[in-house]
Amino acid sequence: MHIAKLAEKITGKPFYDGLTPRMTEEELETAVEFINEHFVFLESKDGGMATIDSVIDRTKQAVMRLGVRGLLIDPYNYIEQSGQEEHSGISHMLSKITSFAKAHGIHVWFVAHPQKMYPREDGTYSVPKGMNISGSAAWFAKADLGITVHRTDECVEIHCWKSRFKWVGQQGVSALSYDLPTGRYEQFTPRVELPSSLKGSQRDWSDFDDL
């Protein structure tokens, strides 16, 4: 499933049949070659829950043997907390992974989901940020960079709510469009509608055919 999703993003075409023409076998083969050259999937072979120590150990081997420079953990709650209280377990996990990342010069991404959000009086929801991530405020305190992918009816908003180092980025928001068949994002272009007072006054250009 992960390979299929990555192949869609690489080729810009869907993996499965649908309204949008799917990728060809040749395009899939090229995408898989790229994935094999740039990605390593760390899975628990015995089917058990991973611990942060087992993740670090396997990542260390990938760094030393394959030159891996980044680690994506999605989602974080698949990592067992070894009986610790959730807040303490998350704080301990983040401290360990931060020390490991600095020691080996790699970047680590965590995918985490917010706690239950409640609607405002107008029925809309506020954008979840670091303090709203389920489990612990340590997500905000210990992250170097934090972003939220927030979907609205019109677009997808990317909110940067923390950037520890100014040369990496700054707080702000950017609007993108999401292409469902391929999983790609692109710059959002708002739809512009004419005021109702002008809609009936548009000229039919066929009137000028004889000019």
Predicted segments, located by residue:
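Walker A/P-loop NTP-binding active-site region of P-loop NTPases
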Residues: 1-18, 75-80, 142-144
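Conserved protein kinase catalytic core
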Residues: 2, 80-81, 119, 168
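Nucleotide-state-sensitive switch-loop elements of NTP-binding domains
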Residues: 9-43
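C-terminal regions of RecA-like/P-loop NTPase motor modules
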Residues: 13, 17-18, 32-34, 49-68, ...
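Phosphate-binding/switch loop-helix module in NTP-utilizing enzymes
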Residues: 40-103
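Hydrophobic/aromatic beta-strand patches that form the interior of the parallel beta-sheet core
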Residues: 40-42, 109, 145-147
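Structural recognition of the conserved hydrophobic beta-strand(s) that form the central parallel beta-sheet
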Residues: 72-73, 106-113
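Short, ordered loop/turn segments at secondary-structure junctions
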Residues: 76, 113-114, 151-152
